[in-house]
Amino acid sequence: MKEFQGYLEKDRSRQQHLLYPLLFQEYIYALAHDHGLNGSIFSEPVEVFGYDNKSSLALVKRLITRIYQQNYLIISVNDSNQNGFVGDNRFFYSHFYSQMISESFAIIVEIPFSPRLVSDFKEKEIPKYHNLRSIHSIFPFLEDKLSHLNYVSDILIPHPIHMEISVQILQCWIQDIPFLHSLRFFLHEYHNSNSLLVTQKKSIHVFLKENKRLFQFLYNSYVFECEFLLVFTRKQSSYLRLTSFGTFLERTLFYGKIEYFICRNYFHRTLWFFKEPFMHYVRYQGKAILASKGTHLMMKKWKYHFVNFWQYYFHFWTQPYRXHINQLSNSFFYFLGYLSXLLRNSSAVRNQMLENSFLIDTVTKKFDTIVPVIFLIGSLSKAKFCTVSGHPISKPIWADLSDSDILDRFGRICRNLSHYHSGSSKKQGLYQIKYILQLSCARTLARKHKSTVRTFLRRLGSELLEEFFMEEEQVLSLIFPQTTPFTLHGSHRERIWYLDIICINDLVNHS
């Protein structure tokens, strides 16, 4: 740990050039083992094979020796392909090494982007309270901002990303060529391995539950690059007109191209480039929304800007259907588990002035959120709580549990959904979801006791289930440490929100 801290205290520019030697340091793999492998599936096989901490250190030394020999990846892949059962030591070695290398790459690649990591090792007093910024803080923000806007674009960020593109993104910040070559070789050799979440097309897919730290970092760097270039092109070229935005896509020569085109085109031409001061961008998971006060033509230009941007810069063949343009006053858009829209309420006020009277029509806008019943029923059907049409069914996999455990599981899901969607203006959809869960719980208990639902409820009493589902659980207040995100291209002065609490229940995340 002291060696690792001393390395971090060096100049940041030197860190970017000296990442490759860290692959041969034992303390890096010790950190990787403590961070990623203690709570993973590899902690159990170590005990099965009779390895302790000293034996794990011997495995690390053997891994470093293989790295020196430059054939550790090929050997690991061959071992994992030939031995497909956990009882084989070679199978365990190959997967242990692959997981260890993946975690080590993740730790090393995060070093240039963690300038404040050194201060985290120092003992300091932790403040008792922080201002939490949860997903629910988005809705007051949207209610305040969207009431003045006209259109919103629902954008699906393209995925999966190609491994070569992710390595090229890292080349903008990391100048250690041997380290990048090792990372590229590691990703390409393991694109078909089951131990790493990489698809057969050599693309990183991060929307799976069991995710690795390295691939999460690569995806986050890709999203950060998209957002940075979006802000960069909008700020630096907002005064350019009748100039193709594809010309200014390469940011390394951006200022030179601006100077060249301005000098060549100094005539009085109407120059513009998506200039829109009233614009808001919000991203969550793999989706984003772009709201604007501009016209429908302006939103279509932004739509095709994104399509060409992903095509020419990230080599994505993106279809236009990934970005939907909706008018806020006429349609709903799905965001963070809610169907949101902008309602217009008109009212007439009679004004009397002396002998004359006249009517004043006032229009007020209200940001409305309703429960997406269809999406929630689809999620419940995938979890085997009901059919696709919303008919409650029993949960056979829970029939072996005790009655209290069954009630507790159903009640926890119901209360979580109730807490999350309690801010909706219309509660009928929420009551329908609660009824489906309540009847599914009753069918599961009746299946366990080999009885009908009516007989079971008559014997147990319907009031018990009713009181159980109506009982409010005390909400736990979570305190998260305040973290400052790394600034890859310098600090942004835009008001960008980084949320601490991002999810409350898996059923909120719809595909």
From Swiss-Prot:
GO terms for cellular component: chloroplast. This is Maturase K. Its main location: plastid. One of its GO terms (biological process) is RNA splicing. The keyword Repeat does not apply. Usually encoded in the trnK tRNA gene intron. Probably assists in splicing its own and other chloroplast group II introns. InterPro entries: Domain_X, Maturase_MatK, Maturase_MatK_N. Keywords: Chloroplast, mRNA processing, Plastid, RNA-binding, tRNA processing.
